[in-house]
Amino acid sequence: MSKSLIVSSPGKTILFGEHAVVYGATALAAAVSLRSYCKLQTTNNNEIVIVMSDIGTERRWNLQSLPWQHVTVENVQHPASSPNLDLLQGLGELLKNEENGLIHSAMLCTLYLFTSLSSPSQGCTLTISSQVPLGAGLGSSATISVVVATSLLLAFGNIEPPSSNSLQNNKALALIEAWSFLGECCIHGTPSGIDNAVATNGGLIAFRKATAHQSAMKEFLKPKDTLSVMITDTKQPKSTKKLVQGVFELKERLPTVIDSIIDAIDGISKSAVLALTSESDKNSSAKKLGEFIVLNQKLLECLGVSHYSIDRVLQATKSIGWTKLTGAGGGGCTITLLTPECKEEEFKLCKESLLAHKNSIYDVQLGGPGVSVVTDSDSFFPQYESDFDFKKLNLLSKFNKYYI
């Protein structure tokens, strides 16, 4: 068993297909270069320690206090399709005095995976840190689930670190995705599975849900080039549930009109997949994607899910690129693809304008690699661990070892 290892995985953004995907349209998600990290250290102490270093929180439990009697995992290589409700209830009792909802969710997810994948006789410390902003629709909870699941699968010998054996790597990725989905269920109840799929595999994922007229689809794609984009967090709170309900009610009132909009968004998503995976000229591809972004945003406005905070970002960024909301809308985040002609001075002025309105800005690359692993058998691990401990997360990517 490795005594110390660090795992990371990327957040995600929805490029095209928001809301329409609920009704069977194709949507396109991409990994972003903001990553979450988990350091696992095995210890001789008879306890599990979980540290959320970004918010200065630490929780610890004696191993014997965990509800091992509810663990029913017969074979880690064949995870269940849904979480063990008795185990969830037992862990919920352990966390009943945890008042902070964010901490409660993270601890429940981590403890569920720990009890399912570890041993009652092996102490561990799990330290979690993240560049992915919470509650911004960028898949922060999925990244946590993926890094915790991967760390435990590695530490207890159920998968191997990345190697030149692609078959072994693919098997490991499938197992990580399956277990991280169960971790996501602890947080979100009934997640789509897309966030943890992107956080595991990276790249792009085109997906659609099953309907009476079509089967479900999930296709992993590798773009010709990574795309540099700007994500703007408007900090405007929103209710995804209310926004989805609003589109449903609009569709009930105007079915023919809204069905046409959904079909148009489906066409945009499919066209974007072709542009990203087959377009040879990067500038030509960017301009084509820019047109799709503008069209998709207009159609989302027709569905009533935009917001004045998003409009403000659209206005501020129109001279430097193409912008649309990403995720549920109603505030939240936008994504801006810069034009090939964008000048540094224009970009700087735009960012200053957005920051003046209390937005947060993230310069990211889309379509990059998925989960990565560095272990204490790697010669550079001491430096990597030091950078992690001092939260120099931006320095770590050059060392990461990826499954894909």
From Swiss-Prot:
GO terms for biological process: ergosterol biosynthetic process; farnesyl diphosphate biosynthetic process, mevalonate pathway; isopentenyl diphosphate biosynthetic process, mevalonate pathway. InterPro entries: GHMP_kinase_C_dom, GHMP_kinase_C_sf, GHMP_kinase_N_dom, GHMP_knse_ATP-bd_CS, Mev_gal_kin, Ribosomal_Su5_D2-typ_SF, Ribsml_uS5_D2-typ_fold_subgr. Mevalonate kinase; part of the second module of ergosterol biosynthesis pathway that includes the middle steps of the pathway. Erg12 converts mevalonate into 5-phosphomevalonate. The second module is carried out in the vacuole and involves the formation of farnesyl diphosphate, which is also an important intermediate in the biosynthesis of ubiquinone, dolichol, heme and prenylated proteins. Activity by the mevalonate kinase erg12 first converts mevalonate into 5-phosphomevalonate. 5-phosphomevalonate is then further converted to 5-diphosphomevalonate by the phosphomevalonate kinase erg8. Mg(2+) binds at S141, E184. Its main location: cytoplasm. It comes from the Eukaryota. This is Mevalonate kinase. Keywords: ATP-binding, Cytoplasm, Kinase, Lipid biosynthesis, Lipid metabolism, Magnesium, Metal-binding, Nucleotide-binding, Nucleus, Steroid biosynthesis, Steroid metabolism, Sterol biosynthesis, Sterol metabolism, Transferase. SUPFAM superfamilies: GHMP Kinase, C-terminal domain, Ribosomal protein S5 domain 2-like. Its EC number is 2.7.1.36. Gene3D superfamilies: 3.30.230.10, GHMP kinase, C-terminal domain. The gene is erg12. It comes from Schizosaccharomyces pombe (strain 972 / ATCC 24843). Pathway: Isoprenoid biosynthesis; isopentenyl diphosphate biosynthesis via mevalonate pathway; isopentenyl diphosphate from (R)-mevalonate: step 1/3. NCBIfam families: mevalon_kin (TIGR00549). It is found in: Cytoplasm; Nucleus.
